[in-house]
Structures are given as structure tokens and as C-alpha cells.
């Protein structure tokens, strides 16, 4: 977690930089995160009693459900994993079991903690890596092996003295060369020189085929046990100094990190600040008034998810992980089903319900221009590499937004994702001709938008296939 936790208002402001509208959803996740901080300040007895209030987001596709959860996890440095509810199967059937979401969360947490620890020791690791690079670029003299014959031992006194002096001179030359190379490395003059480095060979896992209920974890455990018994193979690779430094820095950093301590911290972080985002939860809801064998299977998955959301202990290769204080955010479009179609026990575990609104024309205009990673900024940057300054007039932006809105209304509503298809269609010819275009500035006008998209957008049959 951050040293200075963000207030709910600050969290919403940060989210506004990337996501347009959806204030209710932003507030809900901001409060959930702030409550985690509040809980951490309580005494231990009360802290254990307070569980996170899980959130259920409802709204059409492409309005920002997943993006809100993903950005929130980045803001606070929390372990975050996004899973699809439809990927899981009931216990006893072939497929992923629901406990794998917790194992994925712990793996993410371990990766986060490991990165942080590596950044802490990066300076020392780089220093050690540079020393190793110097030794690789200027190897030491080879030590002479093999016993001397008896005559040499008796009569070769002067020769020994001469050899000793020659070796001293050679050592001094090597040391001077190493100082010179170290200086050149520091100045970055040797970045493109090649050097041969020994690196650990990545062996393909024989347990990749072990998938399904329980087998996945068993395969990982057996693989870990065998890898600790078998010596790690190394292979020689020819790399540039720049690439070799990265490899050696990682190796040196790994030596400086206590992995047992890192794993312990990662498990604790997953338990206390982990976020699991369950997408497409409406797809495992039983359809109203319908009944089939598929519905029975869906209900089975819900019943398997239930104990994890309620709070249970899951075994992972890093130890037992409790899910009591993991924050679960579920999301679904709920076109065909309603939240009430979920089993009652699961409904009760998502007390905070947030409905995300459909995007209006004004929302589309904001999405195109306002966020830090706005689509128009991306296209401008791409064409800038070809020496073209791409500009959009305000009326053209409005026209693009209107086309996106109307196509969503007339066909399937896919939210902001519609803008991707429309902009690709609009700029297709320009992107193709860009390397040969001599104009330095290209301005997109409403007339150009109408010319490229107008006829397609108005024809419902065409827009279904093209936009």
C-alpha cells in the first residue's frame, strides 16, 4: 500500500484521468479502498471482524467496468487479478477450478513484491553486474595446472622467478585493462559490443498437460519439488553489453533477495489488500424461467465461488492463503439475466450494487479527447512517427462521437470500443498512404468524416458488418 493513502476524492480524481463519467462506480471502489486503510488502523481484534464490502457492477460492455478495477489496483499497488467466470467448471469436471483465481492472485502478489525488492537492491545489483561484465570483457590469466617434473623442481629456480615476474606483469596489465573497460562501461561506450554470458536455460515444463480440478496445483508442486532436486542447466549466449547487463543485474538482485521472506510478504499482501475482479458473472446466472443441464452446471460454479467469496483457506505453493479480506468486484452486462438470478447466498456477498450508465454523445467526445491515454492522442502519436501532424477539428470530433453513438443504438451497443472500429475505418487510407504523403499537416474535418463514414453509418446492414 502507499505510504500516504489517497482519500476517496483523490482516488476519483485519479480515475477521471483515464475513465469518463461513471461517478457512482468510481465512488464505490474509492470508498472500498479507503475502508481498507481505515481497517488497518484498528486494533487487531476488531480488524479481524471487519470484512470488505464486495461490489457488483452492472452495465453494458465498453463503459469502463474492467478499466475502473484495473486502474484502482495500479493506483494503490495492490495485487490484482481479472478472471472470467465462464472459464471455470464445477468441481469434478474437466477445466479450471475456482481456487485457481486465488493462486493467480498470490502469483501476482509474489511478482509485485519481487519487483519492489529488486528495485530496492537495484543499485548494488547493477554495480555487481558491471564488475562481472568487466571480468567477462577482460578475462583473467589462465592458471597453470599440472605438476612440474622433478628436474624442473631441482634446477628451475631462476625460471620460477622469471615466470613469477611475468605473471605479475600480466596481472598488472589485466588490471589496467579492466580499469579502462570499467571507465568505458560507465560512459556507455561499449553498449553495442558483444559478450558471451552463461544464463540459466528455461526448461519446458512436463506438467503443462496437467490441467483440471486439483491437477493444476499438483503439477506445480511436483514441478517445484523436482526442480529443487535437479541442477539448473546453463547455456552460453552471445548478448550485447546492454542486454547482458540486464540479465546479470537480475541474477545479482536475486542473490540479494530473501525469497522466503518475499513469499511470506506476498501472501500477506494478497490476503490483506488483494483484489479479484470476476468478469462476466451474469453468464453463470440461471436464466429467468428457463431450466436446462447448462443451468445446473452454472449454478454449480456459483456454489464453488461462494466459499471463496465468503472467506476460506486455499492451499498454494507459497502456503495457505485466507480469502476473508480479499476484495471481490464482480461485473456483468446483465442483458439476458438479472442480479436476482444469481443464487441468493452469492447475491448476499455483493452488498454494494453499482449501475454503470450507457455512454452519451458528450461522453464519446470526452473519451476521444480528455483522458491521458485518449484515442486521438494515440493516433496523432502514431502518425507523428511518419512526420505527419494529425489534427481533428472540434466539429469533426463531434461528428465521430455522433456516428459512434448512432451505430451503437442501431446495432449492438459495445460502448467505447465502437470508437476503435470507427477511427480505424476513418484513418485507414491515411495510415496506408502515410509513408508517401508529402503534407506535414493533415486536418480531419466533418466533411471528411461524412465522406468516409456517413453512407456506412446510415445503412444499418452495412454498419453491422463494417463498423
Curated annotation (Swiss-Prot):
Region annotation (Disordered) maps to 147-174
Q: What is this protein called?
A: ATP-dependent protease ATPase subunit ClpY
Comp. bias regions, Basic and acidic residues: 165-174
Originating organism? Bacillus licheniformis (strain ATCC 14580 / DSM 13 / JCM 2505 / CCUG 7422 / NBRC 12200 / NCIMB 9375 / NCTC 10341 / NRRL NRS-1264 / Gibson 46)
Name the family the entry cites. Belongs to the ClpX chaperone family. HslU subfamily.
Q: Which PANTHER family match?
A: ATP-DEPENDENT CLP PROTEASE ATP-BINDING SUBUNIT CLPX-LIKE, MITOCHONDRIAL-RELATED, ATP-DEPENDENT PROTEASE ATPASE SUBUNIT HSLU
Q: Which gene encodes it?
A: clpY
**Top-level taxon of the source organism:** Bacteria
Assembly and partners are described as:
A double ring-shaped homohexamer of ClpQ is capped on each side by a ring-shaped ClpY homohexamer. The assembly of the ClpQ/ClpY complex is dependent on binding of ATP.
Amino acid at each position: 500500500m502507499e505510504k500516504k493513502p489517497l482519500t476517496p476524492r483523490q482516488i476519483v480524481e485519479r480515475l477521471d484521468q483515464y475513465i469518463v463519467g461513471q461517478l457512482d462506480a468510481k465512488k464505490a471502489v474509492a470508498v472500498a479502498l479507503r475502508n481498507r486503510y481505515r481497517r488497518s488502523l484498528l486494533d487487531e481484534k476488531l480488524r479481524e471482524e471487519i470484512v470488505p464490502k464486495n461490489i457488483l457492477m452492472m452495465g453494458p460492455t465498453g463503459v469502463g467496468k474492467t478499466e475502473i478495477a484495473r486502474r484502482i489496483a495500479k493506483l494503490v499497488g495492490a495485487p490484482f487479478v481479472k478472471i472470467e467466470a465462464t472459464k471455470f467448471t464445477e468441481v469434478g469436471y474437466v477445466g479450471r477450478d475456482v481456487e485457481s483465481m486465488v493462486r493467480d492472485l498470490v502469483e501476482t502478489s509474489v511478482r509485485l513484491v519481487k519487483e519492489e525488492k529488486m528495485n530496492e537492491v537495484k543499485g548494488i545489483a547493477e554495480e555487481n553486474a558491471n564488475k562481472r561484465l568487466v571480468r567477462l570483457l577482460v578475462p583473467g590469466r589462465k592458471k597453470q595446472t599440472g605438476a612440474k617434473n622433478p628436474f624442473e623442481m631441482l634446477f628451475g629456480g631462476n625460471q620460477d622467478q622469471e615466470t613469477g615476474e611475468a605473471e605479475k606483469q600480466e596481472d598488472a596489465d589485466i588490471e589496467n585493462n579492466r580499469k579502462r573497460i570499467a571507465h568505458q562501461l560507465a560512459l556507455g561506450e561499449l553498449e553495442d559490443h558483444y559478450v558471451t554470458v552463461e544464463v540459466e536455460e528455461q526448461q519446458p515444463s512436463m506438467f503443462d498437460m496437467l490441467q483440471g480440478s486439483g491437477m493444476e496445483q499438483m503439477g506445480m508442486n511436483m514441478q517445484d519439488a523436482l526442480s529443487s532436486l535437479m541442477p539448473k542447466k546453463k547455456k552460453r549466449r552471445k548478448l550485447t553489453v546492454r542486454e547482458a547487463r540486464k540479465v546479470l543485474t537480475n541474477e545479482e538482485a536475486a542473490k540479494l533477495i530473501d525469497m522466503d521472506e518475499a513469499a511470506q510478504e506476498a501472501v500477506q499482501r494478497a490476503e490483506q489488500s488483494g483484489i479479484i475482479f470476476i468478469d462476466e458473472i451474469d453468464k453463470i446466472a440461471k436464466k429467468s424461467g428457463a431450466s436446462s443441464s447448462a443451468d445446473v452446471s452454472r449454478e454449480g460454479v456459483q456454489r464453488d465461488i461462494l466459499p471463496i467469496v465468503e472467506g476460506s483457506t486455499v492451499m498454494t505453493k507459497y502456503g495457505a492463503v485466507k480469502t476473508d479480506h480479499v476484495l471481490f468486484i464482480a461485473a456483468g452486462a446483465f442483458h439476458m439475466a438479472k442480479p436476482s438470478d444469481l443464487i441468493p447466498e452469492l447475491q448476499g456477498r455483493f452488498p454494494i450494487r453499482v449501475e454503470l450508465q450507457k455512454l452519451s454523445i458528450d461522453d464519446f467526445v470526452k473519451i476521444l479527447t480528455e483522458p491521458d491515454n485518449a484515442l486521438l492522442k494515440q493516433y496523432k502519436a502514431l502518425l507523428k512517427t511518419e512526420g505527419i501532424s494529425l489534427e481533428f477539428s472540434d466539429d469533426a470530433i463531434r461528428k465521430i462521437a455522433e456516428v459512434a453513438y448512432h451505430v451503437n443504438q442501431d446495432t449492438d451497443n459495445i460502448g467505447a470500443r465502437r470508437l476503435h472500429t470507427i477511427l480505424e475505418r476513418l484513418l485507414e487510407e491515411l495510415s496506408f498512404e502515410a509513408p508517401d504523403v508529402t503534407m506535414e499537416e493533415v486536418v480531419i474535418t466533418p466533411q471528411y468524416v461524412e465522406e468516409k463514414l456517413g453512407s456506412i453509418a446510415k445503412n444499418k446492414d452495412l454498419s453491422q458488418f463494417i463498423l
